[in-house]
């Protein structure tokens, strides 16, 4: 059971529901009269369409050593997006924290009697949230870049039951995803999924997710599992569209690299959602 098993498809062309969203792949009707003829030097409409379609096809293939820099770039950019999302967007989901910040603002007025300072209090609190979100997420990124993302071949390509894929468009790596075996419960974990921000909305993430599911099915795993701290609902809808079911949540989750200091706990909170796609019963 290995990602380079001969029976497995190592390079897969995307066939996704969002196929029309990939620029240049939607074919327009062309009506040609019987009097129109193409010379040997002219390109027929079908040939032109075929050339455009081929240029815009996205392929999922196994990671190669030459992909390393692009993979790290995509992963790094995806993680950095979580800083403002966690600091500001995430607050909408944290009712208790909202009340706490409101209480601190009121106490600021009670203790100082200063309207100016009270007016500034919410901005100070948001600034502190951004600072600690950046601090925690940069620590998490550093941990990842010095563990599995430092040596993808050793962590994902060599071990039995694990693999790492990249999505390639026009010769450029535009997306990544990994699968890691969990032999204790015969499941595989979907990890490190990220798509270049310039190529989102084209069905690439869904195709990467399907590749992991296909890998799990071919290797007779009972389920695919994943965990996400994503704040944006689009990420959760993606997993649900692939058939995953949310099976639990961990409030106030501790990311690798966190110190759990009082100020860090006050200004950084994140929810960890657990998803599972059951493939077959044990």
From Swiss-Prot:
Coiled coil: none
Molecular function as annotated in GO: L-aspartate N-acetyltransferase activity
UniProt keyword Acyltransferase, yes or no: yes
Main location: cytoplasm
Membrane topology term: Single-pass membrane protein
Transmembrane segments annotated in the record for this chain: 103-125
Annotated keywords: Acyltransferase, Cytoplasm, Endoplasmic reticulum, Membrane, Microsome, Mitochondrion, Transferase, Transmembrane, Transmembrane helix
GO CC field: endoplasmic reticulum membrane; intracellular membrane-bounded organelle; mitochondrial membrane; mitochondrion
Catalytic activity: L-aspartate + acetyl-CoA = N-acetyl-L-aspartate + CoA + H(+)
EC number from the UniProt entry: 2.3.1.17
Localization, UniProt: Cytoplasm; Microsome membrane; Mitochondrion membrane; Endoplasmic reticulum membrane
Enzyme class: transferase
Record flagged with keyword Cytoplasm: yes
Domain spans labelled N-acetyltransferase: 110-269
Cited InterPro entries: Acyl_CoA_acyltransferase, GNAT_dom, NAT_camello-type
Superkingdom field: Eukaryota
Function of the protein: Catalyzes the synthesis of N-acetylaspartate acid (NAA) from L-aspartate and acetyl-CoA.
Similarity remark: Belongs to the NAT8 family.
Name listed for the protein in its UniProt record: N-acetylaspartate synthetase
Source organism of the structure: Danio rerio (Zebrafish)
Taxon lineage: Eukaryota, Metazoa, Chordata, Craniata, Vertebrata
């Amino acid at each position: 059971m290995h990602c380079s098993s001969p029976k497995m498809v190592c390079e897969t062309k995307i066939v996704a529901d969002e196929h029309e969203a990939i620029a240049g792949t939607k074919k327009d009707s062309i009506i040609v009269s019987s009097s129109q003829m193409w010379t040997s030097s002219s390109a027929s409409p079908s040939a032109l369409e075929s050339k455009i379609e081929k240029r815009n096809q996205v392929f999922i293939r196994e990671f190669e050593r030459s992909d390393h820099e692009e993979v790290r770039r995509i992963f790094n950019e995806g993680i950095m997006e979580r800083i403002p999302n966690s600091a500001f967007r995430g607050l909408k989901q944290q009712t208790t924290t909202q009340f706490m910040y409101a209480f601190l603002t009121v106490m600021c007025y009670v203790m100082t009697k200063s309207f100016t300072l009270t007016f500034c209090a919410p901005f100070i609190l948001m600034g502190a949230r951004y600072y600690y979100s950046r601090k925690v997420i940069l620590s998490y990124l550093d941990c990842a870049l010095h563990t599995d993302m430092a040596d993808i071949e050793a962590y994902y390509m060599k071990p039995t039951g694990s693999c790492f894929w990249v999505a390639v468009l026009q010769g450029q790596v535009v997306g990544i995803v990994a699968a890691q075996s969990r032999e204790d419960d015969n499941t595989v974990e979907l990890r490190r999924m990220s798509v270049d921000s310039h190529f989102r909305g084209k069905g690439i993430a869904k195709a990467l997710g399907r590749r992991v599911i296909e890998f799990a099915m071919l290797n007779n795993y009972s389920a695919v599992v994943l965990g996400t701290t994503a704040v944006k609902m689009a990420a959760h809808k993606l997993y649900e569209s692939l058939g995953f079911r949310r099976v639990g949540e961990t409030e106030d989750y501790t990311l690798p690299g966190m110190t759990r200091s009082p100020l860090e706990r006050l200004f950084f909170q994140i929810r960890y959602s657990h998803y599972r796609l059951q493939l077959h019963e044990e």
